């Protein structure tokens, strides 16, 4: 019988061992690649931005369903109850995963009057739209639709970059003491905007009748951009140049339909404060 030399056996053993090690190494590498892919898989956003040809970028859920705000919810609580709640179901997401352009600190959770949790965005409760169909049933609109926009003049898609919005609230007129429900302009933080009747009735060589001590009580408003709810027209907004800036410099002030816009200092720069309507019977909330 032919015998193989010892050194040849060792050589062959080492060769097969090397091959086995190579195969094991490749298998480990492939397995490692698969694990890496799994680890790098990003979760699908549960709230993201979607761009509409007419409305621009607005908030939608994971399936692309539009999300709305209610102009009556200025105080940050859900005021859509009864039959309203059937048409405008609440949006609630306990495990928020946000798409690009959205910030976690802008979202929170509230509890409605019937004990249900609801997600809010920048202080506004979030809703879907479910109009009544031909069979008399409330059916949520399809993904990609935004048919709830401007319904009743108080429902609008949620956007991350509104500069001027509309709110609806009961307002006390400080001269007549009458309380009425009004739709009025607010800034991106929910602060009320006002107009000065004398800017309309008393022509002046200055762009505004409110100067000196007046402007300390009624600070000027300047919008940083022109993203508006759809019931407002960009062409209705403009800018005037004032000469009472810091150290005598000029500064700008936003106008709406030719009327300069102001804040009211006693509102404390707070959301849902409307203390200036009817002051002196010459100041009013800015209405669309």
PLM region descriptions:
Residues 72-76, 96, 131-136, 197-202, ...:
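Acidic glycine-/aspartate-rich tracts in secreted/extracellular proteins
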Residues 48-66, 111-125, 134, 164-192, ...:
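Short, low-complexity cationic-aromatic patches
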């Amino acid at each position: 019988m032919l015998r193989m030399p010892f050194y040849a056996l060792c050589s062959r053993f080492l060769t097969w061992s090397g091959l086995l090690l190579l195969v094991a190494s490749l298998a480990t590498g492939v397995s490692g690649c698969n694990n890496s892919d799994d680890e790098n898989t990003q979760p699908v956003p549960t709230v993201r931005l979607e761009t509409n040809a007419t409305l621009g970028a607005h908030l939608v859920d994971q399936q692309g369903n539009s999300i709305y705000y209610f102009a009556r919810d200025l105080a940050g609580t859900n005021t859509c109850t009864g039959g309203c709640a059937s048409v405008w179901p609440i949006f609630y997401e306990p495990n928020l995963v946000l798409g690009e352009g959205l910030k976690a600190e802008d979202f929170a959770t509230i509890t409605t009057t019937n004990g249900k949790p609801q997600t809010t965005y920048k202080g506004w409760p979030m809703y879907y739209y479910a109009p009544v169909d031909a069979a008399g049933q409330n059916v949520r609109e399809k993904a990609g639709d935004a048919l709830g926009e401007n319904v009743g003049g108080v429902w609008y898609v949620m956007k991350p970059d509104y500069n001027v919005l509309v709110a609806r609230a009961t307002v006390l007129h400080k001269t007549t003491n009458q309380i009425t429900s009004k739709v009025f302009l607010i800034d991106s933080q929910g602060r009320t905007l006002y107009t000065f009747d004398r800017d309309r009735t008393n022509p002046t060589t200055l762009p505004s009748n409110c100067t000196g001590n007046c402007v300390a009580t009624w600070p000027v408003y300047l919008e940083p951009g022109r993203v508006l709810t759809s019931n407002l027209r960009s062409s209705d907004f403009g800018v005037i140049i004032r000469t009472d800036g810091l150290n005598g410099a000029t500064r700008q002030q936003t106008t709406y339909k030719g009327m300069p816009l102001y804040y009211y200092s006693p509102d404390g720069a707070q959301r849902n404060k409307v203390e200036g309507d009817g002051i002196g019977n010459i100041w009013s909330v800015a209405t669309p």
